Structure formats: C-alpha cells, structure tokens
C-alpha cells in the first residue's frame, strides 16, 4: 500500500490573487527563446557530448534560429571551458547570436567564468543561487538574509568584472528552485539583485523563474509568474524568463500559461531533454503556436533532420508519440480516422482554403518535412476503407468504387491481422493486384471477337476454359460488349449473377496509357464480388475485370 500521507504541497501561493492571465485564451507572439540543450540537456545525458558533438549541435541550434544559446557552465569542467573557448577562438558565434554561460553565485566560479568569456562579443552571464525553503533548511542551513546576501554579492561581482573587462555583457539571475520558494521572498531577492544591476532600456536584465522541480499544477505556476511580473522593479527594463521542468508532465503548460502571465522569454530544450523528466520541449511550445497561426520564429521545417541529429548527438531516442516529432504522431490506423482524413484531404484539394482544417491532423505534416504516404495513413487490422482507398489512390492512381474500397479494406485487415503486422503501401498495392487485378483462375478467357448486330446489339464470340481444361467457344448477344461477354460466360458455365457496377479511368495521362476498369457483380445471395482489369485496351481491361470478379465469387 502506498503511503500517501508521506507527501504534502511544497509550493506557496502569491499573497494576493493573481489570475488576470486566465482571461487570455492564446499566445499572440513568440517569446524570446533560449536553448539550454548544451548545458541543462547535456548534463542530463548518461554520456555527455564530446566537444566536437557540442560544436555541431551549436551549429544546428543556430540553423534552427535560436538567438540566445546557453553553451555551458565553463567552471564545471575542462570540456565545458574548452567548448566556450573553441566557439570564441574559431569565430563560430554569429553576430546576431548571444551565448549564455551559467555560474553559481560563488566568487571563484564567477571569476573562472569571466576568464572563459575573454574575447566574446555578445554574452549573457547567468548567475543563480537556490532560494527554496527546503534548500535553505536542508542544504545551505542559512537564513533568508544569508541567501539574499549571496545573490546580491554575486550580482555585484558580475557587474564589477564586466566593467573591468570593458564589455557590455547582459546579466541574468535565477532564484533556483523558485517553485519551492515563497513568492514574496523570491520577489525580495530578485529586486535586490536588480537594484545592483540598475537595468536600462538598452541593457535589460533577465530575471529567470525556474520550476527547477515542478511542484504544482500549471495555473499555480502562472499565478506565481504573474505576481512576479506585476511587482518586479524596473519591469520595463526586465526580461522575465521561465525555465520549466517536466516533473509532473506539465512543462509545456507551465510555459504557455507563464507566457500569458507575463513571461517574455522561455529557456528549454529540443525534444524536452534535461534532468529527470526533462526541460520544457521548445519544439512543442513553438509548434503549438504555429498550429494556431502564430509564428514561433524558429524553423522546424525539417523535423526528420532535427530528430536524426538530436538522436545522433545525444544517444537519446525520441518517443514515437512525442508531439509533432514522434514517428507515429500523424499516423492514423483507425478506419474512421482514416476515412475522415482522406475526405478532408480531398476537400482541401477541391476547395483550396486559406487555412488548414483536416480532421485528426492539427497541422499539415508536410510543413515540417513529413509526408502523407509514410506518416499519415497506416494500415493494420484496425484500418478501414478510407485509409486503404487513400493509399491506392494517392500513391498508385487507383480510384476504386466505394464498395470495392470496402472489400479491399477487409482483405488488407485480414492479412494484417493474420500476420500481426502493419502493411506498407507497396504491400497493399501488391495485395490489391494479387486479389483483384487480372485474376485468371478458375475461369479464363483466351479470346474474344465482336460483331455488330441490328438494333444496337453486340454479338460476342468468347473462347474460354475452366481450371485449365479444354477451351470452348460460345456465342452470345448483349446490349454492349461487356454485357455480351458476360452473357456468354453465364451461358457456358451456368453462372448466376448480375452486373451491377462498372467504372474505368486511365492510369496515366498519355495516348499509350494503361487503362483500368472495375467491375462489381452481385450473386443471388446479394453478396458483391469485385474485379479489376488493366490493359492499354479498355475493352480488354473491362473483360479482365469481369473475369476477376467472377473468379472472386
């Protein structure tokens, strides 16, 4: 039995209600994004990235469009230090990109950090110390006053060393474990730091509010953020930043609600990599904006490339259900879902609307480098006629009649169920050909000749055999060529059925194109049987379709 009494709430509500953010229903503008993949993400890996891998990852982040990138904790290890030096000395930092470095509010660590920054043009120095009740009590064993003093002294040293270096580095402060800190106290510490830095319009300070450990529901975090946003000093000259983690699975919601509550900036990682359950996934937050018509100002147009690079650099695997980027996120196996998607895609093609509204697909997969054939309609034992028909039509140009699509879907489902596997598009096409196209056993036609009679009648001379036996020739009349051939076969083999469906179309747009015909016949018991015929001669194609339908009875 689990001991629920072992736990209690560890967060603190603001001293006054802060719920103005809840009046907003969406994000209207992208925040400033800061990638922490190379620091927070890297330190969470079983095997941290090598210097070479980090350089390549940095280039990838620049390509995606990040303008602020936390590149590490230079005082933590030689690899971290050398990575920053490599970026600076090899001139790998674009002029419009600012690198961010992390340091504890400890003098020797801050000094080593500045040593690592020598020669860097654009940098954010990010200093932090933990302010939560639990850490004050258990880790540091210090009072609120002592913790505030650590923050202020760290802020002073950052300012002093920046002036000595003759640089205009920007400053960032994080009350680490903000979510476990009393909001009034977090505000006091942050305002004391801001008093040291005296931010201006052309040199804003960053106050970062990390949910170092996610402790509450997202609306609580948003209320804490709103309280800070409303009460920070120098607010017009402060960039309010968030650093959500995902311990309760709500990192994305924390970020989104936090933006509504006044945050200007989000720190996170690609695919949510990071300590424990990870940092907030910037891709999800950004794509959530995109699917509502808000430009995330990051380029995710080649998601497969991003996925491959991330897995290569980190050794991590992306969950197939991870929003927007997982291998199965657009996949529809359910028959009803496939049918709705197929109809939605046809509607989009016919109407060409300005906005995307296809059922079950929140965005157009092609916008992020995915494709319909491999990523959307997937066929297994749960699939239906819509999915099978869509694949055969869009990939192979086969426009099956509705009832024939249904018959083909039953065939595909049966095979998938028997084999316990998903069927690829090429397997579905081969299954269609094996089952419904030009089937010549047990009945087979060897030759047909036609003669025009009076009153529009057609006489067919049909040579055929059954189960490889001797060929026999019979004559029969009909209202058309196909009807005459059908009557000949009925006469020869005493067959009973009604010809109830016939359609045809070209498979290619050229004078020598193959044509395909679809024939449906109804047996006395009311069951439909289907066949397709493919031939440059549409008459021959229709005869082959009829014979196949008879053979499929």
Regions picked out by a protein language model, each given a short descriptive name:
Residues 2-39, 293-475, 511-514:
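A mid-to-C-terminal "edge-of-domain" accessory segment
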Residues 40, 44-45, 74-78, 132-134, ...:
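Short, small-residue-enriched loops and turns at beta-alpha junctions
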Residues 216-349:
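Catalytic alpha/beta core domains of metabolic enzymes, predominantly
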Residues 527-530, 534-553:
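Mixed-charge, glycine-accented linear interaction segment located at domain edges/termini
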Residues 7, 33, 47-68, 84-90, ...:
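Alpha/beta enzyme core
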Residues 1-107, 371, 376-379, 383, ...:
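N-terminal capping/small domains of soluble enzymes
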Residues 460-464, 507-530:
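Positively charged, aromatic-enriched nucleic acid-contacting surfaces
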């Amino acid at each position: 039995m689990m001991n629920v009494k072992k736990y209690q709430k560890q967060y603190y509500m603001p001293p006054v209600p802060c719920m103005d953010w809840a009046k907003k229903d969406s994000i209207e503008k992208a925040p400033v994004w800061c990638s922490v993949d190379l620091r927070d993400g890297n330190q969470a890996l079983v095997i941290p990235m090598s210097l070479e891998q980090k350089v390549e990852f940095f280039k990838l982040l620049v390509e995606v469009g990040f303008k602020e990138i936390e590149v590490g904790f230079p005082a933590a290890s030689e690899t971290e230090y050398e990575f920053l030096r490599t970026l600076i000395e090899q001139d790998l930092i674009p002029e419009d990109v600012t690198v961010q470095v992390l340091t504890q509010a400890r003098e020797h660590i801050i000094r080593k950090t500045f040593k690592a920054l020598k020669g860097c043009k654009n940098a954010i120095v990010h200093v932090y110390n933990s302010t939560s009740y639990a850490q004050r009590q258990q880790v540091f064993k210090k009072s609120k006053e002592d913790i505030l003093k650590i923050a202020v002294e760290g802020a002073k040293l950052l300012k002093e060393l920046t002036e000595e270096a003759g640089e205009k580095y920007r400053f960032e402060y994080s009350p680490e474990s903000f979510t476990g800190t009393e909001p009034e106290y977090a505000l006091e510490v942050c305002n004391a730091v801001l008093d040291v830095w005296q931010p201006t319009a052309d040199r804003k300070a960053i106050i970062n509010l990390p949910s170092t450990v996610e402790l509450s529901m997202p609306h609580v975090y948003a209320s804490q953020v709103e309280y800070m946003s409303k009460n920070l000093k120098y607010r017009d000259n402060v960039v309010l930043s968030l650093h959500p983690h995902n311990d309760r699975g709500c990192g994305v919601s924390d970020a989104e609600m936090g933006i509504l509550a006044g945050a200007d900036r989000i720190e996170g990682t690609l695919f949510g990599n990071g300590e424990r359950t990870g940092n907030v996934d910037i891709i999800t937050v950004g794509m959530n904006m995109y699917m509502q018509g808000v430009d995330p100002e990051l380029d995710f147009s080649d998601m497969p490339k991003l996925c491959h690079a991330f897995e290569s650099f980190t050794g991590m695997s992306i969950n197939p259900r991870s929003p927007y980027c997982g291998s199965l996120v657009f996949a529809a196996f359910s028959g009803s879902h496939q049918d709705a998607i197929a109809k939605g895609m046809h509607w989009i093609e016919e109407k060409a609307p300005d906005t995307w509204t296809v059922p079950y697909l929140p965005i157009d997969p092609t916008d992020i480098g995915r494709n319909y054939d491999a990523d959307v309609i997937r066929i297994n034992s749960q699939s239906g006629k819509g999915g099978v028909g869509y694949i055969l039509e869009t990939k192979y140009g086969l426009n099956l009649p509705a009832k024939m699509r249904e018959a083909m879907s039953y065939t595909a489902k049966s095979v998938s169920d028997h084999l316990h596997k998903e069927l690829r598009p090429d397997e579905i096409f081969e299954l269609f050909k094996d089952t419904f196209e030009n089937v010549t056993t047990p009945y087979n036609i060897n030759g047909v000749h036609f003669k025009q009679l009076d009153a529009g009648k057609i006489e067919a001379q049909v040579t055929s055999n059954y189960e490889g036996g001797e060929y026999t020739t019979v004559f029969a009349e009909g209202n058309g060529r196909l009807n005459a051939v059908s009557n000949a076969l009925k006469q020869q083999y005493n067959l009973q059925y009604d010809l109830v469906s016939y359609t045809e179309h070209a498979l290619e747009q050229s004078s020598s194109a193959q044509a395909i015909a679809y024939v449906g016949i109804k047996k006395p018991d009311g069951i439909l049987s289907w066949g397709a015929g493919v031939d440059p001669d549409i008459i021959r194609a229709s005869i082959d379709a009829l014979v196949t339908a008879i053979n499929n009875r």
